[in-house]
Amino acid sequence: HMLNANESNSTIQALKAINRSPQHVKLVKNLPVSAGIGGGSANAAAIMRIFNTESIQAALSLGADVPVCLFSKTAQMGGIGENLSFCPGLGQLNAVLVNPRVSLSTAKVFKAFDEMFVEDGSVLPTISEGSLLIRAINGRNDLEAAAILLEPIIGDVLNVINNQTGCCLARMSGSGPTCYGLFKDAGASLKAANAIRSIAPDWWCETTILGDK
């Protein structure tokens, strides 16, 4: 469906940040609204790339995820997103993205996380070694439990993904509600996506490839 752009739109904000406003922009977006997979950040970064602007500070002023989207390379992020460590040569992963089409407030997820958090002195996982898949498996999403508390259907999504043949990892993206599954090959991811669409036809489900070539 068509949406009217206003001053809060990331595309308009990006044009203003690099002093290229006004422009006529036609944006075709094939993602659910507020999917939690960086769609708005990617839009802002795309505007900056069109005008050959690679300013980290300008990108960061638009959002913590915009710098990594600007360079569009496999990377680990530090700080609030301004410290990027690129990870070349890790290859690609076949993935399935699934969104149950529920609305989930990022602020509410973080609030729920804060209320659940208990300092236990545990050491953060190491995600700087091994293949792209190993790094993903060794990592974690601390917001997952909080999001499931607010929207239990996210737990259902993860279970459905995890039950698909060839699934190596199922996890929530960011603060949700979109979840992803990593699969051993393109055939497995395609079969999984078709199966998930049959199980839950109301969910948004797409295959994709993550990582650099």
What are these regions (language model features)?
Residues K29-V33, S61-V66, K73-Q76:
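Acidic, glycine-rich active-site loops and adjacent beta-strand->loop/helix elements
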Residues P177-C179:
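Conserved glycine-rich beta-strand-loop-beta hairpin in the small C-terminal domain of fold type I
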Residues F71-S72, Q76-L169, K184-L190, N194-D202, ...:
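Conserved, helical-rich catalytic subdomain that frames metal- and/or nucleotide-binding sites
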Residues H1-A35, G89-G91, N99-P100:
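ATP-binding N-lobe of GHMP and related small-molecule kinases
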Residues A35-L62, V68:
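DPxDG-like acidic metal-binding loop motif
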Residues Q23-L27, A170, C205:
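Generic structural signal for residues in well-ordered beta-strands
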Residues A17-Q23, F51-Q57, S72-K73, G166, ...:
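Short glycine/proline-enriched coil/turn segments at helix->beta-strand junctions
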